[in-house]
From Swiss-Prot:
Keywords, in A-Z order: ATP-binding, Cell inner membrane, Cell membrane, Membrane, Nucleotide-binding, Phosphate transport, Translocase, Transport
Function text: Part of the ABC transporter complex PstSACB involved in phosphate import. Responsible for energy coupling to the transport system.
Family: Belongs to the ABC transporter superfamily. Phosphate importer (TC 3.A.1.7) family.
Species of origin: Ehrlichia ruminantium (strain Gardel)
Keyword Chaperone: no
Catalytic activity: phosphate(out) + ATP + H2O = ADP + 2 phosphate(in) + H(+)
Residue intervals of the ABC transporter domain: 7-249
Name of the protein described by the UniProt record: Phosphate import ATP-binding protein PstB
Binding-site residues, ATP: G39, P40, S41, G42, C43, G44, K45, S46
Amino acid sequence: MSIEIHASAKNLNLWYDSNQVLHNISLDIYKREVTAFIGPSGCGKSTFLRCFNRMNDFVSNCKIKGELIIENIDVCSVNTNVVLLRAKVGMVFQKPNPFPKSIYDNVAYGPKLHGLAKNKKKLDEIVEKSLTSVGLWEELSDRLKDNAFELSGGQQQRLCIARAIAVKPTMLLMDEPCSALDPFATSVIENLIQNLKKNFTIIVVTHSMKQARKVSDKVAFFESGKLIEYNTTDEIFKNPQSSKTKRYIVDHL
């Protein structure tokens, strides 16, 4: 298991207008591990997740103070190239959101945008490798021209993951990636997350304690915009240090 730090937050605070949503968050995210963010609705876990690729920029009157460093990139700096940041830090949302394009073009869009493929052959290789990584190549290699909306929900979500990794990120953010999926598709995604950590650092927000326990190496528990506890998954579930953490886990298992 890696001990190399991939991202580090120090005294991170965030406001929407005068409402403070995050309070002095400090934690390190380690390379090629899965870190789960858990906590009640409105606790700030998704807001904190969106700090990693500046998705909070789309929220008006959002103000951030503190430090968030990802691979020597000062994420909060006004000088940071946000387009390149979002290529390095991919994101998968709650509901599958494929582009209204073919399966092939969904995956090829990012590499073409960022100039990662010099020719059609190279682009084909990226598409095949990305779809293979999420277990879709064998299922869909003869359907690449089909519209992505024709896929099942689980396939669409895996396609969105393939689209994210096609631009060669080092980190993947997943905001409740299974919340709109059936149990079978959820199991497929959970197994995929465990496999993808061989090549990517993954942060997943989840309301499912079973999912957090299954897929993660470390767990961060949030409440009221504060980081209450952060430890290995085994320690969080077997020996939580905070009574708040213990109560939340017991109530949601």
